[in-house]
Structure formats: structure tokens, C-alpha cells
Regions:
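Alpha/propeptide regions of enzymes that mature by internal proteolysis
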Residues: 1-295
Length: 295
């Protein structure tokens, strides 16, 4: 699929990103895991691609460069134990559906922390009117970033008021956020680059400046303009794309959905015991306490 990429702060990894930058597309699934499990997830993605499209791989010289992204979960997970294995990622791929994904403490988000509350996987979406048609834009985040005093919700500095249940020693940014923006709008790779950059505004609304130790990496892709692999296609390609002058509502949809997805990740999360330091608990945000701040 055609794609674009942006890194607000590059202290992280997203495999396949160099080719997205150069060619404007990627092939295969997207996996998001913890920092030390990128290799295991990558192996699973390659195996899944080869097994799923065996005829193409056996009869052509093809190579796999799947997209695998990561954030650091070493506070809540024994990250150095390398407990995520290729078979776990394979099971996730085999069980993938078109149903709305679970949020909070699921998948790669199981061990993530967001603004010193329990973070994880979050989603949000918007409908966008463009060119006389209704299109969809969806966002998935793995939210693992920010310090408590930074947190803002709808522009309100709620983190400064929610000062209880902080993790001991958690006084520096050491997380990251991965943002995936998917749309059926027909967009060129250059337009998808620009769309990916708007995730910066979405997470910025939540309060983060993109800390030095944070890997804030954003990928946008379009399911329009279906394409075959270059090795299996003819000499010419044609594409339909949205007029640049109609992009503003698309940008706003992305900004709003990214902001909402981060909040949804926190609201869906559950309390989780810490691994380092042991004996503490990372609390989920108290939705009722948050609501009272807006009363």
C-alpha cells in the first residue's frame, strides 16, 4: 500500500521505514511490540508473508521488508527476558480480524505507560467528506510517552491536578509512541508524508513535547490505488489522488483522532504491577476523577 512516514523524535525503531521514505509504499502486515522483541516479530512477519503468498515467493525473486515498530516497556515487563517469541506474533497475525481492535492492556500495549498512567493500545476514527464522497480515517496508537505534569485533556492541564499514584523514580521521559494512520482516501505518498506529520499535533495536544528519550514515529497509509508488487506488475502505473486544496479536513480528522486514541488507550487500560522497580503498581487513569475536573 502507498504510505508516508514522519519521526518527531527518532529514538526508536520502525523496520521498513527507509523504503517507505524512498519508494512511498510498503508490503505486508504492521506489527507493534516492545523494543527488544522487534527481531522476533520481524521473523514472524516474514514467515507469515512467505506462507500466505507461497506461490509468489516460490516462483519469483521477492524479499520481505515488513513494518515492525516498538516502544519500551521495561518498567512493567521483564523486557530483557525476551519473552515475546515469533510464535506469539504469528498467532496475532493469524487471529487478526476486521473487527474493532481491543484497547488498553493488549498486544504490544500490555506493558506501556502514558503520562505515568497505564497506557497501551488506543484507537479512534473519523469520517471525512471529500470530492463528494464519504471516506474513513482510522488511527491506532501504542501510547507509552509523557510525564504526568505534561498531561492535557481538551486543553486543560489535568496532569498537574492528578498527582497521586505516581511511580517512584519516574522523573524523566523514557517512553515512546507509535501512531498508525489508515485511510481509504486516495492519497499520494507525498500527501501521506504530510498526513503522518499531523500526528505531531495530535500528540502535542495531549501535552508531550516529544522528549529526547522518546521514539515518536508515525506511519500513514492508504488502501486506495491498489498495486501489485513491482516485480509482478507491468511497466506503467496510474493513480487517482485527492486535490491538495481538499486536504485540510483530512488533516483535522487525523489530529483529532490521534488525540482521542491516546486518551482511549489510557481509559481502557487497567492497573499493572511494575517489574522495575518491583513492588509498585502503575495505575490506570481514574475516569471519574478526570470527569470531575471538567465539572
Amino acid at each position: 500500500v502507498w504510505a508516508g512516514l514522519h519521526a518527531l523524535n527518532g529514538n526508536g525503531e520502525m523496520t521498513g521505514s527507509h523504503w517507505v521514505k524512498d519508494a512511498g509504499y510498503f508490503t505486508g502486515p504492521i506489527l507493534i511490540t516492545n523494543t527488544h522483541s522487534v527481531g522476533a516479530a520481524h521473523e514472524a512477519a516474514v514467515r507469515w508473508m512467505v506462507d500466505t503468498y507461497r506461490d509468489a515467493w516460490e516462483n519469483n525473486h521477492l524479499w520481505a521488508m515488513p513494518v515492525v515498530a516498538e516502544t519500551y516497556d521495561g518498567v512493567l515487563n521483564d523486557i530483557n527476558g525476551l519473552h515475546v517469541r515469533p510464535e506469539h506474533a504469528t498467532k496475532a497475525l493469524e487471529n487478526a480480524t476486521s473487527e474493532p481492535p481491543a484497547e488498553g492492556n493488549v498486544g504490544g500495549g500490555a506493558g506501556m505507560i502514558c503520562y505515568e498512567f497505564k497506557g497501551g493500545t488506543g484507537t479512534a476514527s473519523r469520517r471525512v467528506e471529500a470530492g463528494g464522497k464519504t471516506h474513513t480515517l482510522g488511527v491506532l496508537v501504542q501510547a507509552n510517552h509523557g510525564l504526568r505534569p505534561w498531561l492535557k485533556v481538551l486543553g486543560q492541564p489535568v496532569g498537574e491536578k492528578m498527582t497521586d499514584h505516581r511511580i517512584p523514580g519516574f522523573n524523566a521521559e523514557r517512553g515512546s509512541i507509535i501512531v498508525i494512520i489508515a485511510t481509504d482516501l486516495p492519497l499520494l505518498p507525498s500527501q501521506l508524508d504530510r498526513l503522518a506529520r499531523r500526528a505531531t499535533i495530535g500528540i502535542g495536544r495531549g501535552g508531550t513535547p516529544g522528549g529526547n528519550n522518546s521514539g515518536d514515529i508515525f506511519l500513514a497509509f492508504s488502501t486506495a490505488n491498489e498495486m501489485d508488487l513491482p516485480q509482478l506488475s507491468g511497466p506503467w502505473k496510474s493513480m487517482v489522488s485527492l486535490n491538495d486544496d481538499l486536504l485540510d479536513p483530512v488533516y483535522m480528522a487525523a489530529v483529532e483522532a490521534v488525540e482521542e486514541a491516546v486518551l482511549n488507550a489510557m481509559l481502557a487500560a487497567e492497573d499493572t504491577p511494575t517489574a522495575r522497580p518491583s513492588g509498585s503498581v502503575c495505575r490506570a487513569i481514574d475516569a471519574e476523577a478526570l470527569k470531575r475536573l471538567f465539572a
